[in-house]
Amino acid sequence: MDARTLTRTTDLDAPAQQVWDAVCSPAAFRTVARGLLRYPPVVGRTDAWEPGETVSGRLWLFGVLPLHRHHIRLARIDHDQMTLTSDEHGGLVRSWGHDIVVEPLDERRCRYTDRVTIDAGWATLPVTCFARLLYRVRQARWRRLAPTLQPTHRIRPHPG
């Protein structure tokens, strides 16, 4: 079966920069995935994702069912465009390409988009169905989390 692409978008009640800073944080990843997926390599981690880094470890469904060893490579983190791209794989999943895009709507609101392209061979359809549920729940959690986000005063290095 060919790869499938799923796109989900939601508007968040928080400034784009605050949401973007949270996207770059493993803490937000843990918050929006809690109860659905557990990924021990990010438990307790407080430093931001780094472009080019790979995080690998066992993925747990609903926090209790061991799935497979999952690999996440942070392929690109573009702070100016507020875009994060990860290339992931593990178990039945040959490729899980995930883009997160944050776009300002005004000074107090932003648009958050998850776009994922999944190739899991014969299992692409059921894996994509799971992804639909996963991102629906994650975005509902982003909507609850967004109004609680605080501004960060982190200075980010700019390449060049």
Predicted features and spans:
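Intrinsic-disorder/low-complexity, polar/charged segments enriched in Ser/Thr/Lys/Arg/Asp/Glu/Gln
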Residues: 3-11, 54, 69, 81-83, ...
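Hydrophobic ligand-binding cavity/cleft-lining segments
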Residues: 1-50
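Glycine-rich portal/gate segments that line the openings of hydrophobic small-molecule binding cavities
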Residues: 30-31, 40-89
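Hydrophobic/aromatic beta-strand elements that line small-molecule binding cavities or substrate pockets
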Residues: 8-10, 69-76, 88-89, 97-104
